[in-house]
Amino acid sequence: EEIIATKTGNDFVTFEIKNVAPIAVAKKYAGIGASLVARIRNTKTPFGIDFGVGDVIVPKQEKRKIPTQLDDFEAPTVNTYSLETTVAEKLDAILSLMEFSSRMKDYYDLYYLANKFDFNGATLTEALKKTFENRGHKFTVEQFEQVMAFGSDDAMQKKWKAFCRKIDTKTDDYGTVLKT
């Protein structure tokens, strides 16, 4: 509440906290998830923010400007995970859940990041190693191969197509996304 009450000089947008709850309760890592609604006059935009607790960040946290959709507003700067740690955490989630994952967003985010940013291989490898260790996971080559095989899995293809319709994107087919 203190954060969203901070004076910014922006009187047009208001925020309401809908829910705050622990995330990843059953896992060996934790955090807090907040569901909010932003309002500009009669327009409501729901969104969520996850606050990680106890995560390993490689090489270090980053300050990142979040672009706004309205030209007259200053882009806020927030502390974020490094992109390498973001990739590692998403890959960890995919490998942990395998075909039970309904989070096509993780696949999309990895695809987007791989196409938008250049990564240092050594730094990314270190982020993967430390994230997997921190979460108590050891993955095999066979698990990676199984994820790649999802490209020809009808159920996963169906989930991917539904996700793409939901976010209104013309992103490549699921098999291409997996190869990226």
Task: Tell me what each language-model feature is.
Residues E1-T180:
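Structured mid-to-C-terminal alpha-helical surface segments
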